Regions:
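Eukaryotic scaffold repeat domains enriched in small/polar residues
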Residues: 1-168
Length: 168
């Protein structure tokens, strides 16, 4: 099973997700304790209860080339204070998508490229307490910063090919 719950002392409490993944990529826990995962190969984003029941599967189906209308290589997820979910759709689509807690798409931003607001593999995403969205644009060797509506705020370029982020 690709999802395993372990107590602080190291005891495995439960596991789940067998047969649901081709290439599991990210796992995050939302403020309510639900477990969210991404699968970069099948391009699903799945929400589980803390006990492993599937609560939501944002499934887009196949991956037609060039994948722009569907997820195509989801890499990470982050949660806004209002409960919205932000998804880094990185391996082929080079964009960020925002969804409501029940899976309705709100907006997206980003295109392939090297300019501000463009991506070459958005690999990780986080949102800080002020609502700033940070995207690790791995192959452009930078972290870009946006407001929640996708307006470019700036970038950091001194840290190499960042593949993971964590907000504090």
């Amino acid at each position: 099973d690709p999802v395993i719950a372990i107590e602080p002392g190291g005891k495995v409490v439960r596991s789940w997700g067998r047969g649901r993944y081709v290439m599991p990529h990210a796992i995050r826990v939302d403020p309510q304790g639900n477990v969210w995962t991404t699968d970069a190969a099948s391009s699903h984003v799945i929400k589980y209860s803390p006990t492993g029941a599937v609560l939501l599967d944002i499934a887009v189906g196949g991956q037609p080339t060039p994948c722009r209308n569907n997820f195509c290589g989801t890499t990470d997820i982050a949660f806004a204070a209002n409960g919205h979910l932000f998804i880094a759709d990185g391996y082929a689509n080079a964009r960020v998508l925002e969804y409501t807690p029940d899976g309705a798409k709100v907006r997206e931003w980003g295109t392939p490229g090297t300019g501000p607001g463009q991506f070459n593999l958005p690999h990780s995403i986080q949102i800080d307490r002020a609502g700033v969205v940070y995207v690790a644009d791995r192959e452009n060797a930078r972290v870009q910063r946006f407001d929640r509506a996708g307006t470019f705020l700036g970038e950091w370029t001194a840290y190499g090919k960042t593949f993971g982020l964590e907000a504090d």
